[in-house]
Amino acid sequence: PLSEPKGVEAVVLKISQGNMSQEEIIFTKGDLIFTDIIDPKKRVVYKEQIKQDRIAGQLSKVFKAESKDNIIKLGNDPKKPTILMLTDALCPFCRKEMARIEETLKNNNVDIIMTSVHGDDGHAKSALIYKEIKGAKTDEQKIAVFKKYYAEDNKAGAKDVSAAELNAAKALAAKYFGAGVNSVPYIIELDKLK
């Protein structure tokens, strides 16, 4: 049962066929079934809130077990909150987010994990970013590496990395997509990971 609205229950249905499955959230009250509930006064879309809470729970487990080598840290101000950003160098929306990373750092520390959705070339860029960032000492140097590989004219791809590096980048992304993330950039405050 949901605490609000009173008397309404959320039900998570898992629909499977073969090796594919997806979850659907519905709401019930008595004999009635609703596909979503929206509270305009509180500005809450309950279905989306439940989805995000479920993803945060799964993401928390994966992130807490993540190797420090796979988390690129920008900012180190204990007074600022930290956000987790899952991103892809070939994603146009991720490029926009990365273009304003300095602005984001004014109010947040950022932990970045490369999670490409764009096939081998995207995973290759992830691997190249991790490799090159190991030598970066400052946030400015790390940001320069990101901007290099996020540039639309950067043609780095699968031919530029070993099979092992490519497979490691694929496995890293698969962990986070397996936790329920289905698009990038995916940004969440670390405090929300329970």
Each language-model region and where it sits:
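Non-globular targeting/processing and membrane-anchoring segments
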Residues: P1-T82, K125, V145-K194
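Structural alpha/beta surface segment adjacent to cysteine/selenocysteine redox centers
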Residues: P81-V161, F177-N182
